[in-house]
Curated annotation (Swiss-Prot):
This is PKHD-type hydroxylase HEAR3399. One of its GO terms (biological process) is DNA damage response. Its EC number is 1.14.11.-. It comes from Herminiimonas arsenicoxydans. Gene3D superfamilies: q2cbj1_9rhob like domain (2.60.120.620), Rabenosyn, Rab binding domain (4.10.860.20). Keywords: Dioxygenase, Iron, Metal-binding, Oxidoreductase, Vitamin C. SMART domains: P4Hc. InterPro entries: Oxoglu/Fe-dep_dioxygenase_dom (IPR005123), PKHD_C (IPR041097), PKHD_hydroxylase (IPR023550), Pro_4_hyd_alph (IPR006620), Pro_4_hyd_alph_FE2OG_OXY (IPR044862). Fe cation binds at H95, D97, H158. 2-oxoglutarate binds at R168. Its cofactor is Fe(2+); L-ascorbate. Binds 1 Fe(2+) ion per subunit. PANTHER family: PKHD-TYPE HYDROXYLASE YBIX (PTHR41536:SF1). GO terms for molecular function: 2-oxoglutarate-dependent dioxygenase activity; iron ion binding; L-ascorbic acid binding.
Length: 225
């Protein structure tokens, strides 16, 4: 699980929120299967909403230029970003995201390796609404500033706590990584981050160049493109 700060600027968050606040929302149960519908109570923009598709492109363009996101996710294919809203006690109980999803408006599918939640409201704007992600190390509570994103394995059990004041507005989506295995992807991420730190201290010395070569050889061995 990784916190990626400042994916969007304050101006981008304001622009997106203005358009979302004027949009028509539908029952979130329309986008899940039978199991999810039993524990899901929120509202979403329809999957092929013109407003949602326009705003989703802003998010994806921002991510393309985010080196931390690319290093951690090694993205190959994205689901178009969706948008949800929780207020008045709305919540989403514990669930695991479906393993394969069809990209709306196409015949393409993707394997959901990583789940992304991008916050579009400040923590003080609402009470409750924490994203709880459960993994082998316990439960992690997530409530981030507007414009920040949390990235976590789609195999994780997770939920959204009831919102008791205000409104929690987020974008969420899934991606297929070039490296399907969480352990291998995490190893590559940690190696890349340490190489970047060494480069800042030592420049492109022989050892840093050698480690960079090892990184790319591992990626070449493990990546499916």
């Amino acid at each position: 699980m990784l916190h990626i700060p400042s994916v969007l600027t304050s101006a981008q968050v304001i622009e997106i929120r203005q358009k979302l606040d004027a949009a028509d929302w539908v029952d979130g149960k329309a986008t899940v299967g039978a199991q999810g519908a039993q524990v899901k109570k929120n509202r979403q923009l329809p999957e092929l909403s013109p407003v949602g598709m326009e705003l989703g492109q802003i998010i994806l363009k921002a991510l393309v230029s985010n080196p931390l996101f690319f290093s951690a996710a090694l993205p190959m294919r994205y689901m178009p970003p969706l948008f949800n809203r929780y207020e008045g006690g709305e919540h989403y109980g514990f669930h695991i995201d479906g393993s394969v999803r069809t990209i709306p408006g196409s015949n393409l599918s993707l394997r959901t390796d990583l789940s992304c939640t991008l916050f579009l409201c400040e923590p003080e704007d609402y009470d409750g609404g924490e994203l709880i992600v459960s993994d082998t190390y316990g439960e992690h509570e997530v409530k981030l500033p507007a414009g920040d994103m949390i990235l976590y394995p789609s195999s994780s059990l997770h939920k959204v706590e009831p919102v008791t004041r205000g409104a929690r507005v987020c974008s969420f989506f899934w991606l297929q990584s070039m490296v399907a295995d969480d352990g291998k992807r995490s190893l590559l991420f940690e190696l890349d981050q340490n190489i970047q730190k060494l480069r800042e201290k030592l420049g492109d010395c022989e050892e840093v160049v050698g480690l960079t070569g090892h990184y790319h050889n591992l990626l070449r061995q493990w990546a499916a493109v």
